[in-house]
Regions:
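Charged/polar low-complexity intrinsically disordered segments
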Residues: 3-6, 28
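Hydrophobic alpha-helical signal peptides and transmembrane signal-/tail-anchor segments
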Residues: 5-19
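Acidic, surface-exposed loops and disordered segments
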Residues: 18-243
């Protein structure tokens, strides 16, 4: 009799738990979908980087190497609002000249991207390529403005901010580029900006193969492309230190 009673109690508990799960499953569908979507994105990021198993630590050295200026992006990958917000939010943690914190940011998602694309220029050293190539345009941007007139302290903040945001983009599996060649007045009009735009960051999933190379004997610092690879000349580490 004791065994039969135990089995009946066990069956009753199982029935209650199953009913509870059935009732709450429908309420959790959206949460589960979002969770699975994020996990799939993390998996794609690891796969694209040739990783397997545990994701390696995002050290500063790795992020700096990954943080290359991409001028071509995967058109099938649409940058989300929360990703841009996460990138912008690093500005609440970084240094600021005189602690003025005068920079403000206008995120631009895919539905407004064309309003930016019409007024920017990429690849100034490769004008014959007319970058970005058709079908590789970025679909998300961050417009950086200042609440005060531009000066040397604002420019210091601008550099710190841009690099910090691009490193954050690299950490979450994205790429970007700083764009200074754009029509400021048209951008300001298109987005009804209260303040003058100083810089634009394009954000997306870069598709270009980019390699760093030492500056040659001729001293040429212009980037160039050969056989599908984008080469960026850099000063040798041993030449950086003043002796």
């Amino acid at each position: 009799h004791g065994k039969a009673l135990f089995l009946r109690v066990l069956f009753f508990v199982f029935t209650v738990v199953l009913r509870y799960l059935c009732i709450h499953t429908s309420n959790r569908t959206d949460m589960a979908d979002n969770y699975l979507e994020r996990k799939m994105e993390e998996y794609r990021n690891r796969t694209a980087a040739g990783q397997s198993g545990r994701r390696p630590l995002a050290t500063l050295g790795r992020l700096l190497l990954k943080n290359r200026s991409h001028r071509g992006y995967d058109a099938n990958f649409i940058v989300r609002e929360d990703q841009l917000r996460r990138i912008i939010e690093v500005n609440a943690k970084i240094p600021s000249a005189r602690n003025q914190q005068v920079l403000r940011f206008r995120p631009v998602l895919s539905d407004e991207a064309q309003k930016v694309l019409a007024h920017i220029r990429l690849g100034g050293a490769l004008p014959h390529l007319h970058l970005p190539l058709p079908g590789t345009e970025p679909n998300a941007f961050i417009i950086v403005c200042s609440t005060v007139e531009e000066n040397r302290y604002v420019d210091i903040d601008l550099g710190i901010s841009a690099q910090s945001m691009l490193l954050q983009a690299a950490e979450i599996g994205l790429n970007g580029i700083c764009i200074g060649a754009f029509d400021k007045e048209r951008i300001r009009q298109e987005f009804g900006l209260e303040w003058e735009p100083l810089l634009i960051l394009a954000i997306g999933r870069g598709i270009e193969k980019i390699e760093l190379v030492p500056i040659g004997a001729d001293g040429d610092r212009n980037y160039y492309r050969e056989n599908g690879t984008h080469y960026v000349p850099k000063v040798r580490p041993e030449e950086l230190t003043i002796k």
